[in-house]
A protein has these predicted regions:
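Alpha/beta catalytic cores of nucleotide-metabolism and tRNA/nucleoside-modifying enzymes
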Residues: 9, 16, 20-31, 35-204
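Glycine-rich, proline-tolerant flexible connector loops at the mouths of alpha/beta enzymes
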Residues: 1-9
């Protein structure tokens, strides 16, 4: 990942660091950072020589990014051009899968969905009132009602396609145990302090 914790989401990730790793290691290196579109993936591989790319925020609300990247690596210019209706079908399916994940608890599922809705609707001319309405949904019926109020024929805005989205805040102060950056190993006590009792717990 070509951005430090201190850099947070500010600026563009430093792909040259990925290239340095590629030149130093004899194992495949996958690069990550600022992959917002298929052309970004091609550029990273070309510039760094990495074996592949890992996708982070770029796929938030844009699950078709993986298909675009697959096509790009295959030498195809084909890209997904979704309508708002296409995106709404993804939103509905996402809500259904979350309901399954939460053992049928629609309220929990729809509350979880809220944080994704802004990503899905980013750039579409739907207005703040629509986003607020989704934030007030309590079950699948509510979600489907709000979807039904949208124009399914609106095209995905070209002006924001493959453009950075989400937080772009700059540097922040990092709090780490004394000597952390000078050591590649951690003690049991340090792992407990950072991750809790179970060092394999990824909930943090």
């Amino acid at each position: 990942h070509a951005r430090t914790t201190a850099e947070y989401y500010g600026g563009h990730s430093d792909w040259s660091r990925i290239g340095e790793l590629v030149s130093e290691l004899d194992i495949p290196v996958f690069g990550n950072g600022d992959i917002w579109g298929a052309n970004d993936a091609l550029a990273m591989v070309t510039e760094t020589g990495c074996a592949g790319v890992a996708i982070g925020r770029g796929c938030q609300g844009r699950p078709w990014l993986f298909a675009d990247i697959k096509n790009a690596f295959a030498g195809s210019d084909e890209r997904v051009d979704p309508t708002l209706g296409d995106v709404c079908r993804v939103i509905e399916r996402h809500a259904e899968l979350l309901t399954e994940f939460y053992d049928g608890d629609e309220r929990m599922a729809v509350h979880d969905l809220r944080k994704h809705v802004a990503w899905y609707l980013k750039g579409f001319p739907v207005g703040g009132s629509t986003r607020r309405a989704f934030m007030e949904c309590e079950n699948l019926e509510d979600v489907r009602r709000e979807i039904g109020r949208l124009d399914p024929n609106i095209r995905f805005p070209e002006r924001i396609a493959d453009k950075p989205r989400g937080r772009v805040r700059f540097a922040k102060k990092v709090h780490l145990p004394y000597g952390w950056l000078e050591s590649r190993e951690t003690t049991h006590e340090e792992r407990e302090a950072l991750f809790g009792d179970d060092p394999m717990d990824a909930s943090y």
